[in-house]
A protein has these predicted regions:
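Short helix-initiation/N-cap motifs at beta->coil->alpha
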Residues: 21, 40, 56-70, 102-104
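Short amphipathic alpha-helical coupling segments at ligand-binding clamshell hinges
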Residues: 27, 79, 113-127, 133-137
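Extracytoplasmic
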Residues: 2, 9-11, 28-30, 40, ...
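Flexible hinge/capping segments at coil-to-helix
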Residues: 7, 16-33
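Periplasmic-binding protein-like
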Residues: 7-16, 84-126, 144-152
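Beta->alpha turn/N-cap motifs
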Residues: 17-18, 38-40, 60-61, 77-84
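Ligand-binding clefts/hinges and TM-proximal coupling segments of bilobed small-molecule sensing domains
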Residues: 40-59, 94-97, 126-152
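Short helices/loops that flank or line small-molecule/ion binding pockets
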Residues: 2, 26-27, 47-50, 61-81, ...
Length: 152
């Protein structure tokens, strides 16, 4: 499979209410940090968080989000798509991104050898990026402007 240029941001990160002073892993040890157990976010957090960080592992995403919204955890570790939904459904909580743990932008897969199709897809992505449509979609679905994305 060949991959197109990136067209959308996806990342895992730390999200918290305004006033929670977290900008890196080193700041997490002052807070209760919620994460869905057994996920890539959990593995990364376990590896990079300082010793003594109070990591609250929850069995599934729904319980993880409920714990955060209820104030049982201070920091939500999750993907930006999930966080965007939590932010939009809880505007009074004033939740904001704190830092990115891992970037994993979205690409379109094309059958290997399909050079014309790959070029068409890349031109389409470029056209929609330059025309602002991808930024509009990023704002609508992620609540953030389209960041610089890698190009292949």
């Amino acid at each position: 499979i060949w991959f197109s240029s990136a067209y959308a941001p996806f990342f895992s990160g730390a999200f918290a209410r305004q006033g929670v002073n977290v900008s890196s892993y080193g700041d997490l040890n002052s807070y209760k940090v919620g994460v869905t157990g057994g996920t890539l976010e959990d593995l990364t957090l376990t590896e990079k968080a300082p010793n003594g960080t109070n990591i609250v592992r929850v069995g599934d995403n729904a319980a993880h989000i409920s714990a955060f919204v209820a104030g049982q955890t201070d920091v939500l570790i999750t993907g930006n798509v999930v966080a965007a939904k939590v932010i939009s459904e809880n505007p009074s909580k004033k939740i904001e991104p704190k830092f990115i743990m891992r970037e994993s932008p979205c690409f379109i897969g094309v059958k290997q050898g399909e050079t014309n199709m790959l070029q068409w897809v890349n031109v389409f992505i470029l056209h929609k990026t330059l025309g602002g449509e991808l930024n509009e979609l990023s704002m609508k679905w992620f609540g953030q402007p389209l960041p610089p994305l890698p190009s292949l």
